[in-house]
């Protein structure tokens, strides 16, 4: 199973738990963290069964361009691969548009969630879209792992769905402002360089200090600010930190001032 790296922390272990071997493919930071199509082509063997795609991306904030989206779909068709598309942040797009693999359900499994679109992160309720053949197989596994989400949560989501559009209409511009503020402040920190994320709720800057990301994240945490070490998202994530702008502008400003002070003291 080909998985993006830097990528969400669960892709590798989920592949292993399914009895597969995860193989990482890179994202081109200089192009807004677009998947490296040439590398993906080189990594495919007769044992490759699936390609995991995440757009908008956690942790990078990258959003697939139409060109890359079409190239991935063509690769899947040519090599008879399943695409597993994580589209949890599809409603949080600030630049460009979201391209969904719902266009290719004959060989795609699209995974989504209400965690972000309805701000119900802790409820752990989502959904998937694919073809009937895949649904039949997934249903078997699903029954023996969790059966179903709690009924009260299902009712709460059902009641909330009609107002989801209005909620997102109000929330997304707020997150866009937070995104711009965070990236601007990160790029003002000596040695930091942050690509502007086009979607999701994270910034993923690089830093020039010769300190492992896990150690640097711990130092920053000891001063009261939480960020995620890049290494948590795979070896290709080392040298980065992930910051979330799902916080007030005041907290973003105060938190990044702390980060700046920490960096300047090292």
Task: List where the protein language model places each region.
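Conserved PLP-anchoring active-site segment centered on the Schiff-base-forming lysine
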Residues: 1-15
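Hydrophobic/aromatic ligand-binding patch that stacks against planar heteroaromatic rings
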Residues: 13-15, 75, 100-101
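Helix C-cap/helix->beta junction micro-motif
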Residues: 18, 78-79, 223, 266
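Active-site phosphate-binding strand-loop segment of PLP-dependent enzymes
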Residues: 23, 27-95
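PLP-dependent enzyme catalytic core of the Aspartate aminotransferase-like
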Residues: 41-42, 209-211, 215, 222-228, ...
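Conserved core segment of the aminotransferase class I/II
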Residues: 106-176, 180-185, 263
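Short hydrophobic/aromatic beta-strand micro-patches
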Residues: 129, 204-206, 244-246
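Conserved glycine-rich beta-strand-loop-beta hairpin in the small C-terminal domain of fold type I
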Residues: 158, 174-183, 194-207, 237
């Amino acid at each position: 199973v080909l998985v993006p790296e830097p990528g969400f922390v669960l892709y590798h272990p989920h592949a292993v738990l399914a009895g597969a071997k995860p193989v990482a493919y890179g994202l081109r930071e200089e192009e807004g963290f677009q998947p490296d199509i040439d590398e993906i082509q080189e990594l495919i063997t007769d044992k490759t069964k699936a390609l995991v795609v995440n757009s908008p991306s956690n942790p990078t904030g990258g959003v697939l361009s139409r060109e890359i989206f079409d190239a991935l779909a063509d690769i899947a068709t040519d090599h008879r691969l399943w695409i597993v598309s994580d589209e949890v942040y599809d409603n949080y797009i600030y630049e460009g548009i979201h391209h969904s693999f719902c266009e290719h359900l004959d060989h795609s499994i699209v995974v989504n969630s209400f965690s972000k679109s309805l701000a119900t992160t802790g409820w752990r309720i989502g959904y998937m879209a694919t073809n009937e053949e895949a649904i039949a197989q997934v249903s078997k596994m699903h029954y023996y792992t969790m059966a179903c989400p709690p009924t009260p949560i299902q009712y709460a989501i059902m009641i909330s769905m009609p107002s989801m559009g209005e909620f997102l209409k109000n929330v997304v511009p707020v997150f866009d402002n937070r995104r711009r503020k965070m990236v601007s402040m990160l790029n003002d920190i000596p040695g930091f360089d942050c690509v502007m994320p086009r979607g999701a709720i994270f910034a993923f800057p690089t830093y020039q200090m010769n300190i492992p990301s896990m150690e640097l994240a711990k130092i920053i945490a000891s001063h009261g600010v939480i960020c995620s070490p890049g290494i948590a998202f795979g070896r290709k994530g080392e040298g980065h930190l992930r910051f979330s702008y799902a916080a007030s502008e005041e907290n973003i400003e105060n938190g990044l001032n702390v980060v700046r002070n920490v960096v300047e003291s090292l």
